[in-house]
Amino acid sequence: MPKVACSVALAFALSAVPGFCHSWPGGKASDRFDTGKGELEIVFLGHASLVFVYGGSYLYIDPVSQYGDFSKYPKADLILITHEHGDHLDPKAIAALSKSGTRMLLPEAARRVLGKGEALDHGTPLDVAGFKVLAVPAYNTTPGRTNYHPKDRHDNGYVITAGALRVYVAGDTELIPEMANVGPVDIAFLPMNQPYTMTPEQTAAAARLIKPKILYPYHFGSTDTAALLKLLADDKAIEVRIRNLQ
């Protein structure tokens, strides 16, 4: 398996961990961060699929087989699903990653579709596999788009805490009022894929509201990430990182 390069994070509270980087199947890239209680490695599988590695535990978010051969990946201690759409909920990937003791948290609507897992309501923090997980709302607001991710379906974004590091993975959402209560976070993954999620302008506005130290646009499809970089160019408090998360 090819080796991948580590990225250097901000020097203050979010400094990257120097040194050895893991190799991941398919040459998937990762960034590593000091949490104050060990390192967190975030692996970018593609689109909305991520892996968090912390304290010997493996957390998968929206694993989808298109973005990895999961027979070659470590088994999951925890799986988080944001909602029921096929580019986020993949029974084949879940089966490949599951072992005895794997826990899976997801919205009730997605749990009904899949037929298993634990429904996690918004605002209910849970400690699992060394992570603290908080589900938060994710939905569309623009007329004509609300059928994609309706508010009353109660899809999830997640705020994940590892050590002293807080990471917001927004799921499929537009800029919503509840984002004002998400921060402070160190890292944010915000979707940018009109008409399903946010425009670059909405993503920039969400970033200014949440104020992450590092922003990863994800789920961005064919959206021009240069537009987001330009919109946030004058905001020196937010570092925008572009990864292979189309």
PLM regions and their residue ranges:
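Positively charged n-region of N-terminal signal peptides that target proteins for export
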Residues: 1-5
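Active-site metal-binding motif and surrounding structural segment of the metallo-beta-lactamase
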Residues: 65-112, 183-189
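Divalent metal-coordination and catalytic microenvironments
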Residues: 52, 83, 90, 133, ...
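Metallo-beta-lactamase
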Residues: 159-210, 217-223
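Binuclear metal-ion centers of metallo-dependent hydrolases, dominated by the metallo-beta-lactamase
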Residues: 118-132, 152, 204, 208-246
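Bacterial N-terminal signal peptides
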Residues: 7-19
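Active-site environment of divalent metal-dependent phosphoester hydrolases
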Residues: 67-69, 85-89, 111-114, 124-127, ...
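Core dinuclear metal-dependent hydrolase active-site scaffold
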Residues: 22-74, 117-183, 243-246
